[in-house]
């Protein structure tokens, strides 16, 4: 069984909106509904768990009804806590693989779901990532240091792992930037699937403006 975990419990404070970004309405749908649709429509995903904050539980339960939705789980104060809550919810089910995706990345392609999951099934762990094409600098007290960009990737989601591996990686109450980091610390190689610019994370107002433009054509582009 392959289960997707959709993380939608963040506050999105950097965006400066009263409503968490994943629940902002764009072209008639809340942002989290875009990746949710891709996950529900995917032939390789058997079930979906949505992780949301307590304040939004009732509204999400009322809004999303689908036979593939396994449960709506209360999120933690951090991303890592939210993932651990979802993994705990799945303890009795023990799926073979889990695919984790950030709801703040609304434009998820079904082909990326399939490719990341397939690679994880082959190697145990995989992530979507975008090869960097920009010049990189490190700024320290107005001093600029140029960082070689060769081999530099921007890590995206979805990320997929065997359930047992991700559960073991999150066995300690630690905080991580994503889910590949604790898995990598176990000595497991992370396979990389080439992503694209559409799978960006809505963080700032300019990201939201871009999302509004893409949403108008997403059904055609996706």
Curated annotation (Swiss-Prot):
Q: GO CC annotations?
A: cytosol
Give GO MF terms, alphabetically: 2-C-methyl-D-erythritol 4-phosphate cytidylyltransferase activity
Note whether Methyltransferase occurs among the keywords: no
Q: Which reaction does it catalyse?
A: 2-C-methyl-D-erythritol 4-phosphate + CTP + H(+) = 4-CDP-2-C-methyl-D-erythritol + diphosphate
Q: What is its EC number?
A: 2.7.7.60
Q: Where is this site: Transition state stabilizer?
A: 14, 21
Instruction: Read off the CDD domains from this record.
Output: CDP-ME_synthetase
Q: Which residues form a coiled coil?
A: none
Superkingdom of source: Bacteria
Top enzyme category: transferase
Stored PROSITE patterns:
ISPD
Q: Name one GO biological process term.
A: isopentenyl diphosphate biosynthetic process, methylerythritol 4-phosphate pathway
Which of UniProt's keywords are assigned here?
A: Isoprene biosynthesis, Nucleotidyltransferase, Transferase
Pathway listed for it is:
Isoprenoid biosynthesis; isopentenyl diphosphate biosynthesis via DXP pathway; isopentenyl diphosphate from 1-deoxy-D-xylulose 5-phosphate: step 2/6
List residue numbers at the site (Positions MEP for the nucleophilic attack): 149, 201
Sequence similarity = Belongs to the IspD/TarI cytidylyltransferase family. IspD subfamily.
Function (record text): Catalyzes the formation of 4-diphosphocytidyl-2-C-methyl-D-erythritol from CTP and 2-C-methyl-D-erythritol 4-phosphate (MEP).
Stated name of the protein:
2-C-methyl-D-erythritol 4-phosphate cytidylyltransferase
- Organism expressing this protein natively: Thermotoga neapolitana (strain ATCC 49049 / DSM 4359 / NBRC 107923 / NS-E)
Q: From which lineage does this chain's organism come?
A: Bacteria, Thermotogati, Thermotogota, Thermotogae, Thermotogales
């Amino acid at each position: 069984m392959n289960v997707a975990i959709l993380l939608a419990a963040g506050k999105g404070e950097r965006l400066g909106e009263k409503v968490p970004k994943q629940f902002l309405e764009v072209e008639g749908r809340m942002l989290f509904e875009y990746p949710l649709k891709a996950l529900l429509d995917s032939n390789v995903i058997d079930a979906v768990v949505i992780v949301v904050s307590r304040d939004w539980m009732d509204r999400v339960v009322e809004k999303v009804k689908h036979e593939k939705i396994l449960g709506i789980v209360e999120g933690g104060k951090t991303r890592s806590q939210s993932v651990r809550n979802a993994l705990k919810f799945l303890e009795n089910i023990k799926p073979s693989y889990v695919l984790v995706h950030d709801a703040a990345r609304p434009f998820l392609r079904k082909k990326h779901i399939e490719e990341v999951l397939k690679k994880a099934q082959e190697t145990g762990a995989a992530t979507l990532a975008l090869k960097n094409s920009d010049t990189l600098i490190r700024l320290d007290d107005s001093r600029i240091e140029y960082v070689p960009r060769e081999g530099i990737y921007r890590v995206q989601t979805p990320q997929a792992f065997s359930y047992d591996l991700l559960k073991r990686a999150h066995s300690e109450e630690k905080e991580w930037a994503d889910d590949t980091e604790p898995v990598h610390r176990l000595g497991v190689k992370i396979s990389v699937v080439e992503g694209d610019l559409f799978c960006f994370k809505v963080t700032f107002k300019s990201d939201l403006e871009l999302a509004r433009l893409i949403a108008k054509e997403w059904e055609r582009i996706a």
